[in-house]
Amino acid sequence: MKHQVPGLSDSARDSRPEVPDGVFLVRVDHAQHRWQGQKPFYLLRLSVLEPKPFAGSSIVSRLYCTPKAMWKLGWFLRDFLYDPELLSQDEVDERALRGLIGVVKISHTVVNGISLVNLDGFAPASQWEALAIAILHSAGWQR
């Protein structure tokens, strides 16, 4: 039996626009260590700070920490200026990740019908101005 439910489609849609592929200045809002089968990862929620049209939007993605993917976790931690003392002790403190700021390059893919956000690259927040000038002008965005 089918029923017409007015307004259902509006509530099912995400009210925020999806953050497109690109380069963004972000802050780590949340980080949580999880496991999927034999693959440990950090579930990250990043809040976009720049460019302004996307400020306040969230990016949710996984950063795997398997031996094969350790280089990417290290890249993220170094560029987001994670505590070098904890890093030298092979320690990741989820609370210490919150509030870190850096630049991230993202892309979207669909795997088995599920939309995923890939973290393709990182840079220190200090490089945002230099990166943003070229990106914003080529995309026609205003700061």
Regions found by a protein language model. Give the residues of each.
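Short beta-rich binding modules
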Residues: 1-143
